Design a protein with these regions (language model features):
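Non-catalytic, conserved peripheral segments adjacent to functional cores
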Residues: 1-110, 131, 138-195
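Conserved metal-binding segment of the jelly-roll/cupin
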Residues: 107-131
Length: 195
């Protein structure tokens, strides 16, 4: 696999090694051994995934920007197995030199790219195709009482969602998240969330 570091430390784009022939293709979508040997040294710590999730959404659906508060913080490894999405990670760690900055990557059924989002980031995506099936691995279980978010429509984040926001389809919960300027982050750059 090819590991691409982004402008924000710890946020990684992962391109799997694809084997194609007349029958189709094959690739390892996840190998704990390879993740530990190749990615953990870049991150400076191990990540152990314990839950896999899948969602199906239609064009214009926007989900996010979500996170889980301590002590139930989550890292995520995400990919799109059908269709096309724009996936985004926003740094919400107080004191971080990249606080409020984001990384956006297009994930498609054809490019097979995966996106690693560390703890201390808000995560969201929008669907660019007619439908999309989205899968993600988490290193902590879902805890609804720790659910949090910031507004996916916050213009100050500078995210180009590609689709016009008037076509956005959001859950009621996601329409109620605070803008970044009104948000009191539970994360701090000086607190190691992996200990």
């Amino acid at each position: 696999m090819n590991i691409i570091k982004t402008d924000i430390e710890g946020v990684l784009i992962i391109e799997p090694r694809l084997f194609r022939d007349s029958r189709g293709y094959f690739f390892e979508s996840f190998s704990e051994r390879e993740f530990e040997e190749r990615i953990s040294p870049i991150l400076g710590h191990s990540v152990h995934f314990c839950q896999d999730n899948e969602s199906m959404s239609s064009y214009g659906v926007m989900r996010g920007l979500h996170f889980q508060r301590p002590p139930y913080t989550q890292s995520k490894l995400v990919r799109c197995v059908k269709g096309r999405v724009l996936d985004v990670a926003v740094d919400i760690r107080k004191g971080s030199p990249t606080y409020g900055k984001h990384v956006a990557v297009e994930l498609t059924e054809d490019n097979h790219v995966q996106f690693f989002i560390p703890k201390g980031f808000a995560h969201g995506f929008t669907v660019l195709s007619e439908t999309a099936v989205f899968q993600y691995k988490c290193d902590n279980f879902y805890h609804p009482e720790a659910d949090g978010g910031i507004s996916i429509l916050d213009d100050t984040l500078g995210i180009d969602w590609i689709i016009p926001t008037e076509h956005a389809n959001l859950s009621e919960k996601d329409t109620k998240h605070a803008m970044l300027k009104d948000f009191d982050s539970p994360f701090d750059i000086n607190v190691d969330l992996y200990k």
